[in-house]
Amino acid sequence: MHVKAETVLALLTPAPPSVVGQHVVDLSGDGWTLSSTALNRTVPGHLPSQVHLDLFEAGVIDIMASMILTFVGLRMPIGRIPATRLKAYFESTWLVFDGLDTFATITFCDQHVGSTDNQFRQHHFDVSQILKECKQDPVLRINFGSAPNIANTIAKSPDAEEWPPGVQITNEYPNRWYIRKEQSDFGWDWGPAFAPVGPWKPSYIVQNGHAELYVLNTDIDIYRQGQINYLPPDQSQPWIVNASIDFLGPVPCKPSMSIEIKDAATGSVLSSGLLQNVTVSGKSITGTTTIDGDAPKLWWPSGMGKQNLYNVTITVQNDMKKSLAKVTKRTGFRTIFLNQRNITDDQLAQGIAPGANWHFEINGYEFYTKGSNIIPPDAFWPRVTQARMARLFDAVTAGNQNMLRVWASGAYLHDFIYDLADEKGILLWSEFQFSDALYPVNDAFLENVAAEVVYNVRRVNHHPSLALWAGGNEIESLMLPMARRADPTGYSKYIGEYEKLYISLILPLVYENTRSITYSPSSTTEGYLYVNLSAPVPMAERYSNTTPGSYYGDTDYYNYDTSVSFDYNHYPVGRFANEFGFHSMPSLQTWQQAVDPEDLQFNSSVVVLRNHHYTAGGLFTDNFKNSSKGMGEMTMGVEAYYPIPSKSDSVANFSAWCHATQLFQADLYKSQIQFYRRGSGMPERQLGSLYWQLEDIWQAPTWAGIEYDGRWKVLHYVARDIYQPIIVSPFWNYTTGRLEVYVTSDLWEPAQGTVNLTWVDLSGKSIANNAGTPETVSFTVGALNTTNIYTTNISELSLPDLKDSILILSLSGEGRLPNASSKKAFVHQNHFTPVFPKDLSLKDPKLEVSYSPESRKFTVQATGGVSLYTWLDYPAGAVGYFEANAFVLLPGVPKEVSFVAQEGNVTDDWLQRVTVQSLWDQKVRD
């Protein structure tokens, strides 16, 4: 299918041929036309954009109608052209596209310019001669092909690689693994399958004079002298700044490079002068300089210190000292290292189990990684704005998170997103875009991937927030075992192909372009046996290790058997948890953005079909069978542990059920995060927790903690609480009755304090003799460690009624945050009930909420009993978060809570419509 779309460029501007310089035309804007022969429609277009967005704006389609839009990608190639003025006198003219999604054919002045087949690459085309020979007003055409159709065509070709049945994971559109496009565009279990096409990133026309260079890409690599990617850097060594520029234009004669490094906050100059060892390789110029190791202020992640940043300006000159190109990038000085080295004798002596490490170290310090996994924040990247991402990242830091895993296969993040992470101290574990599939290894595919890898590694390498490059998502831990089960005799072939792509190809490309970042071939891995960069396979992976008592690598864990959700004996014991979770419903307010009122029922067709867990496995618009399984899992989770909503009003009942699924999700994540954090002081020396997932791509049941419009689910509030630096946590074996209480700290030095243990009944009255439990326990917890402060058995306690009892755990301590000059106070509160919430003899807490304009805070109080899961909720019209939520509130102890408005208009009327509820309200029939 071909689409013809065109706009005429303005007449060339005459000028004397001696005029030199550079003329760059940004093609962004509204002066484009989108035409489709499939729909026989022509509508106004935009750049950057994608087909669905312009059709939606023109009123042709409704983006909310997901079952229809699934097929638009099959029928809607796109063409766009801007109108602008070009200069006739420049020596060279280039078309530069930062991102075309995905299969595009470009013509200029009716002449074929080139084609693209990779969404993740920057493309540039020399149109100098075409422009000179153009006899009429120049016309630019970009014709986009259907990615699903082209993927299917490739799959049917005689030389297409095939895999055993059942290995490749099809969510909706098949054959995604054959093409270099955002894999989740073909459907995933948390999002739609729109398969958009279009110019999703900015595009330019670049005109150069005789000697000028246009900077396509910049690689600034900052590392300690002698640093090697997979070994811990020596923090006593000076800094090396390696600057490399990729350019368009003639190779300069005897070029030189100069550098100026300024403090981004104060403007003071850290270093300036000529770079040394300047070399030219192809269309890249590279030079280095050395900076005293103590001169720069270090960049630290959130919660560990300041995010000190520097502006680095690189200038390229020719042998006549004429400036040919200049570029400025903001960066920071830090080392970040993924330690996968074998456990040492010293570590064994400390009680750490044998095996290998798997944790991150920042500037030479190991730290506890706290965070989540980020997916594409929208099905259409042109809608992702800086303001929207700033709001999301505010929620990340407010949630006490210091790292996000940038999941494959979405897309490589835009530079402005890394900029935000740099500012806010959010480490970004980044991945190449391969996920839950085996991929071809033919020469053409590998060549395409190589260009993609080099471009993106170089593009983002200057960001101090960059923490890791991983080869792909779950390839080693999921796909290789699936291949072995499906084809045991051919398993060596799939291992060989895996190593050819992720180790023999990608690893050397990463290490050739950065000395500062570690590379791991897969997101979930047991690490490596050894690294030999001169070997054909430079890293020997440790596959399927079963050594008893030894721990290797990181873990992911999903268990939808809700009967064992809170049995921590089922949680994986490892060095680092990089994925775990369970899905829940979004709030009523979010559903109302996407669903008609008559469909606001838990099992309505629209609601069920927006649940893509489990996916259709093909292009089916009536996936009730698989979707119902996921709905059933949420239902069973609620029914097993929480009061079952049964309200007379159908919308209120739907809202209560949505909230109930969020309670289950939040408690499950809390249980696991506490377990993993406690592992910091256990033999496994567990030093990381990244839950699945941070945010939503649309309004639907997913694993997200933040809904599509930015509203926090219960999960994000609970994760914020349990990610505090020092926490107190109960661990209950409900089979044996054993109860243990631990204090866990991620500070870098010991902390001290006390924990009050208070038993009350659900009316709020103290239980006699505190049920035989000590009222106060002192603690000292080591750096990055945990300590047991109390152990008992429920059968040994003097509890009159297990169903009418709750233990309140209140921690008060003192410690020093990393890089802080003085100690500070820490408080944390947790609770424990000896039966699950559904079996509690709940009392009506008689909650009241009021707002004070003077303090700008809400006051919540309970007058009738203990309020469990106290939940403040706000109406539509604004987006933000409460500073505390989903907490326990004792009668007679009012709590003040602020609301942080991120977007929208918080009026007096809006404030008065804030509501409060508790677990009691879940069971009350209105």
Swiss-Prot record:
Assembly mode: Homodimer.
Compartments where located: Secreted
Family (UniProt): Belongs to the glycosyl hydrolase 2 family. Beta-mannosidase A subfamily.
Active-site residues per Swiss-Prot or TrEMBL entry: 474 (proton donor)
GO biological process assignments: glycoprotein catabolic process; polysaccharide catabolic process
Gene Ontology CC terms, in alphabetical order: extracellular region
Catalyses which reaction(s): Hydrolysis of terminal, non-reducing beta-D-mannose residues in beta-D-mannosides
Listed Pfam families: Glyco_hydro_2 (PF00703), Glyco_hydro_2_N2 (PF22666), Ig_mannosidase (PF17753), Mannosidase_ig (PF17786)
GO molecular function: beta-mannosidase activity
Protein name per its UniProtKB record: Beta-mannosidase A
Sites where a glycan is attached: 40, 242, 277, 311, 342, 532, 603, 626, 653, 733, 756, 785, 793, 819, 905
EC number(s) reported in the record: 3.2.1.25
Pathway this chain belongs to: Glycan metabolism; N-glycan degradation
Keywords of this entry: Carbohydrate metabolism, Glycoprotein, Glycosidase, Hydrolase, Polysaccharide degradation, Secreted, Signal
Secretion signal span: 1-21
Enzyme class: hydrolase
General function of this protein: Exoglycosidase that cleaves the single beta-linked mannose residue from the non-reducing end of beta-mannosidic oligosaccharides of various complexity and length. Involved in the degradation of polymeric mannan and galactomannan.
